[in-house]
Amino acid sequence: MLQGALDKFTRDITASAREGKIDPVSGRDTEIRQMVDILSRRRKNNPILVGDPGVGKTALVEGLALRIVEGNVPESLRPVTLRTLDLGLLQAGAGVKGEFEQRLKNVIDAVQLSPAPVLLFIDEAHTLIGAGNQAGGADAANLLKPALARGELRTIAATTWSEYKQYLERDAALERRFQMVKVDEPDDETACLMLRSLKSRYAEHHNVHITDEAVRAAVTLSRRYLTERQLPDKAVDLLDTAAARVRMSLDTVPEQLTRIRSQLASLGMEKQALLEDIAVGHQNHGERLSAIEQEENVLMTARDDLEQQYARECELTGELLESRSDISRQSETHHLQQALHDIQQNQPLLSVDVDVRTVAGVVADWTGVPLSSLMKDEQTELLHLEKDIGRRVVGQDVALESIAQRLRAAKTGLTSGNGPQEVFLLVGPSGVGKTETALALADVMYGGEKSLITINLSEYQEPHTVSQLKGSPPGYVGYGQGGILTEAVRKRPYSVVLLDEVEKAHRDVLNLFYQVFDRGFMRDGEGREIDFRNTVILMTSNLGSDLLMQQLSEKPETTESELHELIRPLLRDHFQPALLARFQTVIYRPLTPSAMRTIVEMKLAQVCERLHCHYGLSTSVDERVYDALTSACLLPDTGARNVESLLNQQLLPVLSRQLLSHMAAKQKPQALALAWSDEDGMVIELRQECAL
């Protein structure tokens, strides 16, 4: 009967290990050794594995079972059977008072009386507290305590940090019967080792080859972009999904081809509906029908090209998989691989292996980060960093060069590595590109502007607002909800943090950043350490902008070092010297007329692009328009912001009115011409054709 209780309410992990049903466990030798040390004690020989979800606590127990089967454990543990207790089965159907307690007592007695020693594994150990605790009954934890203390019931428990703190720490009598084994998230090298040990199992299951580059990419990309979860769990899921996607691509029609076929089908349905309307005498849909026909022609051409490519890829893939199975055809395999690569040209419809691109594609679908950003070569990108940012930030070459040099040093590991990647204070007049620099950096370095965390410090002018940034302390309203800054960085540790208008913040708020700039950590309201070491922190300020503009208007050839000397006393008066020494100051100069003209051209090009996107208009702009707008924007106190203001006040209202007039008259404009007249100012001419 007692053996029946064991078979009914527990599962034999060592039996599964003997049958080869457990995946190999690597990279956890230290933790398994700690467990063996504790299990070999005479009394209170009960380890409890504590770690974040997904770090591999259950896998540790499976690793111990594999070692027991292999005999790679001390003599006292070799005859041991490792069983996992299922509390759900214990509770299911235990409707009568005392039945749950009797079942658990039977399991405890069966373990103690078993001829072969039994180790009991209790996953989610916090569920012991309160389990079965009906009115007048005792919970599972209280039934286990005596046996645990005497060492008669050797138990391995597992739980997360939050549940350990919430349940087990409060029950000191239960906590002292367990010895904690901390299970931390592995570093990248250890995580790669873990995935390599599992790779063959997943390759065999999906019947695909997984490259070693894919393993490394799964670890690095999951750590960088799947920040809510822990390694190795998230990397394993990523690799598993990528392998499933490769298998599916070999067995089904590619997504690109399916998408085009769906678009053609939807256009066909719309065309049929319009023809039915015309047949019963409704209004003429000739314009839309001709547009549908043009779209269909484009899509059909794309579909035919894809079908030809797909057929050729299928043929080559079949030959390649066949040649791989014969080791004597290695040279042929290489030629087929090269031929397939030449056909695909970085736009593959089929994937033969799980490679970096496949893994990056899964991450792109999960996170929304563009695939092109995930596949960037970071080394090449760093070499051209100032050029990439300079496409958006005009006229600040010296400042961008200074930022790029410091970031290159940080990224190549030449700096100390204690604090954030870099901390910059961007000083200069309003509208010269300081905030745009942060947007461009987030886009270039971290895959998009969504990686920019913006905190406007003008909202933090009182000392009590510190709690909004880092979270309320215990006992205060809002405790447990996290802080605006700490939660944003915890969820997206690879990001650009923009502290806008830093000179307006209260000094107590600035004191918060001493340790962030120095060590790269901030402790939030709940006591968790938030890691800032992968962030780039930019602060913007208008301090000294009047001095800068006055000096540069009088002496345009003033050097950077002279400008730094000019504003240093002002910065030292406002920021404490200890804080000032923790970041690099970068000076942004007022925009020159040539830089302003470039910005005017960029802004007008964006307007033209929107017009073409929404209305199909082709736009021509007279050179005098650029000259007139540039001269009107050369106000030193507003910078490039005046360009947007002028366009919103002078161009867009008139243009929108004319567009609405043409649309109301059922006329479709084809082209827009922008000119400048000394008498009338901006001249807008829409050339249209009458509606059919």
Task: Label every model-predicted segment.
Residues 1-692:
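AAA+ P-loop NTPase nucleotide-binding core of proteostasis motors
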